[in-house]
Amino acid sequence: METDNLLETVEPYVTQLQEEGWCVLENVIPADVVDEVRDEVETSEVDYNEFSKAHGRWERNVISFMPRFAAHLANERLLATIQQLLGPQVRISQTEYKIRPPHYELVRAYHSDFPYDLNQKWHIPQPFPSAVIGITTLWMLSEFTTENGGTWIVPKTHVDLRNPRGKEDGIGDRNPLDGEMQAIGGAGSVLIMDSRIWHSNAENPSAGKRTAVVVRYAPWWLNLELFGVNTATIPGETFDQLPDGVKMLYEHRAENREPTVWI
């Protein structure tokens, strides 16, 4: 798609992100392939857990186990939307399975994501700057509804100087909050959030599995070399098989490959 047409296409989503702190981009993964992508993700979580048990959770990046899913992470509509907020050069800071079984019970756990998560020792201190420093995406690989537990969000809280995990803010992160709603979408849709927005995983009271992957995008300049599983690497031969656009997003995690961008 030509640049002008692409920017015109994503403008409503960018505007909603700026004003509300979230949006849902539909059909990022096409309907004719989303089932096989979901199957890969569900199967590969077992493989990832077995590998991590044997070798350690920091040894292998999650994306190494799901190449079909990875192929969609540089979707042009998605990246164009994200780049309008983070700038033209972005990379992926975290990839995480988010699969919930049937009849899964869970209380609210409202928070903001890296680098604003006040429970992480490497968070930005309050008050948060009035700038977008992280984008969280939730890839809905099965349909997300109010019946199976669409993600809880509180619109417009991305510009609130308080936080549910702020010790002096008196909000609390375990309770329902005024204005909360559930983000819903069909399989193949992506929930895009300003990482500052207050949000929470949800229970799954339905009889079916709810499958998603969380992928966080960061501006090129943000320090991602922090202790933990998010610094796990991708084997060079696996990295070589990724589409070029996706390589740009994960180059900083490739083993034994000379960087071409993130030097």
Residue ranges, per PLM feature:
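Double-stranded beta-helix
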Residues: 131-134, 143-202
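Short, surface-exposed loop/helix-turn segments at secondary-structure junctions
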Residues: 111-122, 166-179, 209, 228-233
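Residues that flank catalytic or metal-binding motifs in active/ligand-binding sites
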Residues: 65, 93, 106, 133, ...
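Non-heme Fe(II)-dependent double-stranded beta-helix
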Residues: 1-128
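A structural signal for short, well-ordered beta-strand segments
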Residues: 95-97, 137-139, 213-217
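Non-heme Fe(II)/2-oxoglutarate
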Residues: 2-3, 190, 197-198, 202-263
